Amino acid sequence: ACRRFAQLTGKTDILVKDAPGFAVNRFFVPWLNEATRILEAGIANIPTIDKVAMETFGIGMGPFKLMNVTGIPIAKHSCESLAGKLGAFYAPSARLKAQFESGELWPLVGEVDDAALEEVADRLLGAVFCVATSLLEKGVTDMTDIDLGAKVGLRWRKGPFEVMNRVGIDTAYAQVATLLKDWPDLTVPVHLENQHKKGVPWDIRYVKYVQDGDLGRVVLSRPDAMNALNETVVKHLDEAFQEAASDHQTQAVILEGAGKAFVAGADIGFFVKCIREGRLDDNFKFTEYGQSVLNRIDESQKLVVAKMDGLALGGGLELALSADVIVATPKAVMGFPETGIGIYPGLGGTQRTSRYIGKALAKYLIFTGRLIPAEVALSIGLVDYVFAPDEIENKIRSLIADGKMVPKKGRKDEELPPEFQKIKPLFADENIEAWLNGKYLDSEDALTARTAKIIAGKAPLALRFANQIIDAGYEMALSNGVRQELAHLNEIFSTADALIGLTSVGKGRPVFQGK
């Protein structure tokens, strides 16, 4: 019930046991407290500690400024509460108690001492790593939810386990072991000790398989990044789906995203890095593997339902289209923005879309990059069902139980809304070259001229490749049609427009060169 409430209110939930501090406060409060111990020990001043904290954890305020904003009494009482149940390590430092008793805010002025930066970072990281790994030992929650709590709840750039992987397990172990020399009653948590002996990074899962009665749920859990697809996420998706497909206790698989998005596309940073570092083969392998994962979902013997709530852009919409059925809430918004950033859909979007709603409307959506809400997608046959957020779970369960969860994609011409009845013939084969050459820019028809202006702002080469791929694959078997997207992948990512478009995301509308 609590998880459902979180979904209905657009909140990101994590599952924890009823434990002191739950998950986030369990390591956040000691992080604040350790900052005051560093000050008390004379290792560094407040500006130095705040600077290190901001840089190390990717945040806008250090612990002292944060305590000034949220209240020093809250920090002190939180430490006392945890200490009463967990021991002296959590007790407020003498310096924190003194500041509380003074009734004054922490003084934030002073010069940063560069010589103390490393030791401060080691102490802060050691405290967080120690408590985070002890949460695993106590079974309070898992590392994915701990990291998620840090990123969503505290706005840290990375969660504790991601940071441990970044600095290295050996370094993390040393930071904790050094910190605990001052606490002889404590030992390095067993999970960190074991990971140190293995000498491998933490296996943080961004896609989880959860058995829910006779339903299997594959949940993309990277809400801090809108569940964007990258190499790791796609690998985890593959593994989680294979687990779901082989679970004989379930009759259907639900694909869903945690947080406010289904999947908001692919991780743009990966594409940019591949282009700049001349690693187009890595980009090709990623896309090829992604296609194979979506093909396995498409070809699964089990019923697969994509539960779409929030954004489904690019690769996210392509993932949803690989399911047998798409069930959305009115909050769902979907589209293919790729031609507006210099590329084209590469995970089957050109092929599955054209098969479901026809070439003409597929080209319209891909050429324009238009984002459409769930009700519009339903009206043109791109999604199968739309239910209110408070009904969708029960509707999915009842339709599956009654054997009535069946695809309803595609629409006859006369069933389309008036706007799309007009759009569809405009994107017939004989008119495509005129769209690509900008001949409709001066049209007297307002809809045609407006659409032409939108298309004129897209990457010309991406538009032509998309058109070519849709046409070439339309009469092929789907598996062969999807591979048409791979045939031109290195070519499109080698264009100047691809780099211009991909690096423009979040910075304004790109100006393409057509080369």
Where do the language-model regions lie?
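Conserved CoA-thioester-binding segment of acyl-CoA-metabolizing enzymes
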Residues: 198-260, 277, 281, 288, ...
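Glycine-rich beta-to-alpha active-site loop
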Residues: 293-341, 373-374
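Well-ordered beta-strand positions
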Residues: 325, 364, 368-370, 376, ...
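Hydrophobic, secondary-structure "cap" segments at the distal end of domains
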Residues: 350-360
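N-terminal glycine-rich phosphate-binding loop for ADP-containing cofactors
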Residues: 1-213, 221-224, 274, 278, ...
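Terminal peptide-recognition signature
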Residues: 218, 222, 236-237, 255, ...
